[in-house]
Curated annotation (Swiss-Prot):
One of its GO terms (molecular function) is phosphoric diester hydrolase activity. GO terms for cellular component: cytoplasmic vesicle membrane; membrane; plasma membrane. The gene is Gde1. N-glycosylated. The lineage of its organism: Eukaryota, Metazoa, Chordata, Craniata, Vertebrata. It catalyses: sn-glycero-3-phospho-1D-myo-inositol + H2O = myo-inositol + sn-glycerol 3-phosphate + H(+); 1-O-(1Z-octadecenyl)-sn-glycero-3-phospho-(N-5Z,8Z,11Z,14Z-eicosatetraenoyl)-ethanolamine + H2O = 1-O-(1Z-octadecenyl)-sn-glycero-3-phosphate + N-(5Z,8Z,11Z,14Z-eicosatetraenoyl)-ethanolamine + H(+); 1-O-(1Z-octadecenyl)-sn-glycero-3-phospho-(N-9Z-octadecenoyl)-ethanolamine + H2O = 1-O-(1Z-octadecenyl)-sn-glycero-3-phosphate + N-(9Z-octadecenoyl) ethanolamine + H(+); 1-O-(1Z-octadecenyl)-sn-glycero-3-phospho-N-hexadecanoyl-ethanolamine + H2O = 1-O-(1Z-octadecenyl)-sn-glycero-3-phosphate + N-hexadecanoylethanolamine + H(+). Inhibited by EDTA, calcium chloride, and zinc chloride. Enhanced by magnesium chloride. Glycerophosphodiester phosphodiesterase activity can be modulated by G-protein signaling pathways. This is Glycerophosphodiester phosphodiesterase 1. Residues 65-331 form the GP-PDE domain. It is found in: Cell membrane; Cytoplasmic vesicle membrane. Belongs to the glycerophosphoryl diester phosphodiesterase family. Residues 1-3, 270-331 are cytoplasmic. Interacts with PRAF2. Interacts with RGS16. Residues 25-248 are lumenal. The chain crosses the membrane at residues 4-24, 249-269.
Amino acid sequence: MWLWEDQGGLLGPFSFVLVLLLVVTRSPFNACVLTGSLYLLLRFFSFEPVPSRRALQVLKPRDRVSAIAHRGGSHDAPENTLAAIRQAAKNGATGVELDIEFTSDGVPVLMHDNTVDRTTDGSGRLCDLTFEQVRKLNPAANHRLRNEFPDERIPTLREAVTECLCHNLTIFFDVKGHADMASAALKNIYMEFPQLYNNSMVCSFLPEVIYKMRQTDQKVITALTHRPWSLSHTGDGKPRYSVFWKQSVFVVLDILLDWSMHNVLWYLCGISAFLMQKDFVSPDYLKKWSAKGIQVVSWTVNTFDEKNYYESHLGSSYITDSMLEDCAPHF
């Protein structure tokens, strides 16, 4: 949704804002003053991205396209487990994407959902369970290969990081929410394992999470994650709401979010990468982000033909559910 390009990537969006304010205020002077004020505020509160050399160590180590195992490779092993991390390394992944959530007593653990029902033999919201209760659950209980992983437990963030470092894997920390808690927990992890500054990245669908992370530690490499129409439609394209007016409201919000992501929020947060749903990635799309000094990582790329296309034709790193075979995407 770029209007036109300039070196900083802000000419297009602020020209649009100026025109919009001209229409609303009907005063060239007021429109110029308001637009200038918004621009100065953005520049004042925005963060500089980390040096591109450091970011590329994570995104394209050894100057090659990276294959990142989604949730550790959720098709090949129980997702977000130490077994998944080990399998990802064994199967040739460059790195892993891991989801961070918190127990009721504030322990950061690996979990994608806000409930434990889908992946474990337990039930209930994770935020209502203590770490001691969570530790008793079996995260392999509902996996297709559960018999091959009988002794898995939900790992802590620290345990997962230690395992990844043992296998020389880059890490994409996917933060689901709790901006303050997550940024504090990750800051502690980065202080304990300073090598993470050069082989990991924090990413989120939520701009407030990334902004808080940059506030907490500006040396951390960050990325925004995005899927167009995510507020109004599920991952498989179905409308989220049956009521027409409600669905329409969220469609409008999706348009605003998409425009903000591509035109303002990337600059405000000072990101180094943009994680985009694969169906919206094209050579032209990559070129536009590259002009801003930002790498695109595509998700979720799950067939051999798609992987070959992203590696050979696009030269784009990608996230996949399986390093071994074709599989359906996990949203």
